[in-house]
Amino acid sequence: MNPEQFKVLDPKESYTFSKYFDLPFSIQDIVADLGYKFDRSSLRLPTEPGIHLRLNDLTLYLTRNLKWVRPVAEITRREIFIFPILAELCDYVEVMLNDEYSLSVNQWLKGNLDYYIETADHRRMLVIEAKQSDLTRGFTQLAAELAALDLRSSTQGNMLYGAVTTGDLWRFGQLDRSLKVITEDTIVYRVPDELAQILEILAGVLKEAN
């Protein structure tokens, strides 16, 4: 590799997914070095309204946790806010939830995905917990993980989806595989007020055609 063709990433360096969170460079330059363009816009995401019927108990559970628990440790935030949402999703879609899913594409794209879901017909969703509750830098990490999924996958399907979350805030992202564009949604969804929309999108990604 010719070092002059890259803006910020060092061809001699090795980068794990979590390292992208700490890089001081712009997301535009990072994804350009990975071979993609970056965009930020309001996404028209797939939805699955049927999951509405399962909201009551989960809403009560999360509302209680938000009232009485102020987690400092990231593992606590995952266990009491993120995991219950994804467990409900996987039960509805009837698919396994993979946590700390190992993925290695090359020296720039390797590490563990916090949560990764893939259906039998290869619809995929990945979710990461934003370190330090920073959605902006968390999305840079998400972009790298979406790029890794794109490069690893040989199956059909034009779109890949992911989300970065603090537990109570969720932001979605999309990778267009044909255009090589990673798009960050401008909308941030809140739990519990917009839990229905979050679950509709998560289920829509896994149940509707890309």
Where are these regions (language model features)?
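A short, conserved, highly charged catalytic patch centered on acidic carboxylates
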Residues: N2-Y161, L169-N210
